[in-house]
């Protein structure tokens, strides 16, 4: 690491997952920079939030950086404000906003409902019932086209880099999961709907806003976005960026989780000595049922194993104290779970 205090003045970072309430404006990596101040060791985050979005960001320190992909796979809840009657070049308020002028074929998309054209403007206005009617189409497994402003790579290059150069590209389609989608507020005058969306990993909220607007035949984009939950972790328990400091990470507490607390969504298994020795070396285990498990032995968390019931292999291994890593202690209630 370069810059900042000298290495001797930095505090070794413990293994923590920190719930941070990111404000609108900063990038997700700005939160990582804030968490790194005064520390030495690895710091990262799981699940990027765009600068225009706010809410829950999981920042990981020390060995906890190894569980990033596990946390990224958890369902996420978003509070999404959709603005109808206009489109954005980026699908959000940071892009070029243009009034939506529907063609006859596009306007027909709203024929099923009570969409109306604004007098003298040729713009379609929608009602709360119109929005409720189309939401059913966006629950369950749906297909989204990856936005051009995403980090997904096409031809070996992130799409957003092409977008910054003004280039276009054929973006891939992906199947994603929307577990629940509820309208909690509708403003007919402003032509906005506030939605609560519980989605699977890889779902783009801005695409959801655009696709709902397209289904209504009026256009739409994400006017505001706040992530409220990741798995069982809530933004209500998060800390502010200005509170990030080595003193905060010293002990688990509100918004600061140990590895065991962060991995509580995965059941735990205590291993006998023979298998604990095998697991410590990253070998296959035969005793675990099908599924994914935290495995413990010698009084510590050894790793995360996954298998079919006929054999399990490590997904993540945690270093022993002799390897210079943390030594997550075994919680008292993992046996037989």
What are the functions of these language-model segments?
Residues 59, 80, 156, 208, ...:
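Residue-level signal for inorganic ion chemistry
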Residues 70-143:
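Acidic, low-complexity central loop/insert segments
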